[in-house]
């Protein structure tokens, strides 16, 4: 993609695209592999540092291309080791990238949009409205920046980033081409060499793009379910009105069938106090997913200002998990990480230049609600 300088940003080019680029400037295709290794293996963003590339070619590259990662605005480190980067993209908005370390892995949570084109009622990102899709360079640039921060080389066995999840800001399938390109670079040995089983795309349910996915890439799939019936899901995840549960699950199963082996769908379910955490919801979920090869990841709600939702009690969370487990499912409850730096699931907000005015409307509605509560309280007293 050409940047504001009129040059091509090589950071976001897949291997075939990089080869085509070198063809276009009259150079041999093997140069693509050399340059990709410098960019992704060694974190180089200056052609002058590419010591096995001749001076004449380096000068040619300087004239027509660049390696431009997004700008890091800030970095915060949680008490539990979670890291969050605020990154400014070309649109002027800021997005957030989160690194979550555990004993046996390091997971990078990557954003795909500035804001989100969807409006899930319990997610702070959606309340920021929507500005733009990230470019492929801005998506893969989050991996590049994190590796640079850790000073790691992907060829090392002890690398910090072992898994990537497209679960940051935005709906990945509504930025299809750029997300696909970035994931291909993640898995390419000339890029970051991450196993396809360790790259996960999470979607709220854009059915046509799920159907298209298998034609382009083989990655793990996670479904943001959050409700066991259409009536409730229509409220929590409004895209369900367009693609209801039966259609959505058929699409997910169709994609999983193309992967073969023992791959299963990950089902994500944010638990909201007195909304979707009752025994009847667990029973409906067991029935809904009975024939779906899946594992279930329960996510206790992480509060944000004016959300209108609360986190269930620990007893309610355990009860819900136990009911699903007795129903025959592999169930885990996600440990909240990074909440002291607002890096927990559902808390990512960035700084979005909202083109939809959704954020403005959301704040106005919440203010009206707060004013009404104050008036009611005054009347009662």
From Swiss-Prot:
Molecular function as annotated in GO: 4 iron, 4 sulfur cluster binding; metal ion binding; rRNA (adenine(2503)-C2-)-methyltransferase activity; rRNA binding; tRNA (adenine(37)-C2)-methyltransferase activity; tRNA binding
Intrachain S-S bonds: 109-345
Needed cofactors: [4Fe-4S] cluster
Transmembrane segments: none
EC number: 2.1.1.192
Family annotation (NCBIfam families): rRNA_mod_RlmN
Protein name from the UniProt record: Dual-specificity RNA methyltransferase RlmN
């Amino acid at each position: 993609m050409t940047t504001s300088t009129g040059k091509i940003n090589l950071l976001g080019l897949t291997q075939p695209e990089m080869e085509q680029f070198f063809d276009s400037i009259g150079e041999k295709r093997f140069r693509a592999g050399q340059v990709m290794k410098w960019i992704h293996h060694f974190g180089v963003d200056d052609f002058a540092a590419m010591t096995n590339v001749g001076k004449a070619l380096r000068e040619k590259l300087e004239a027509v291309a660049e390696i431009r990662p997004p700008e890091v605005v800030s970095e915060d480190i949680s008490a539990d080791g979670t890291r969050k980067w605020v990154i400014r993209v070309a649109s002027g908005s800021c997005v957030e990238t989160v690194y979550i370390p555990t004993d046996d892995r390091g997971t990078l949570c990557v954003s795909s949009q500035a804001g989100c084109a969807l409006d899930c009622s319990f997610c702070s990102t959606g309340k920021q409205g929507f500005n733009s899709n990230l470019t492929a360079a801005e998506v893969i640039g989050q991996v590049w920046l994190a590796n640079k921060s850790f000073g790691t080389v992907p060829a090392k066995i002890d690398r910090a980033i072992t898994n990537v999840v497209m679960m940051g800001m935005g709906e990945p399938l509504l930025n299809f081409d750029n997300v696909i390109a970035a994931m291909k670079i993640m898995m390419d040995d000339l890029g970051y060499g991450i196993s396809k089983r360790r790259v996960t795309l999470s979607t709220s349910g854009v059915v046509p793009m799920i159907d298209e996915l298998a034609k382009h890439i083989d990655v793990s799939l996670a479904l943001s379910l959050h409700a066991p019936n259409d009536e409730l899901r229509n409220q929590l995840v409004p895209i369900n009105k367009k693609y209801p549960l039966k259609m959505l699950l058929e699409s997910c199963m169709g994609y999983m069938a193309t992967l073969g082996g023992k791959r299963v769908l990950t089902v994500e379910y944010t638990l909201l106090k007195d909304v979707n955490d009752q025994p009847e919801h667990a029973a409906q979920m067991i029935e809904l997913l009975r024939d779906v090869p899946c594992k279930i990841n329960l996510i206790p709600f992480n509060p944000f200002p004016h959300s209108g939702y609360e986190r269930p009690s620990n007893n309610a969370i355990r009860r819900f998990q136990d009911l699903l487990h007795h129903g025959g499912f592999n169930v885990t409850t996600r440990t909240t990480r990074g909440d002291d730096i607002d890096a927990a699931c559902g808390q990512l907000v960035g700084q979005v230049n909202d083109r939809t005015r959704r954020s403005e409307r959301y704040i106005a509605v919440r203010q009206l609600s707060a004013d009404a509560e104050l008036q009611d309280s005054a009347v009662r007293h």
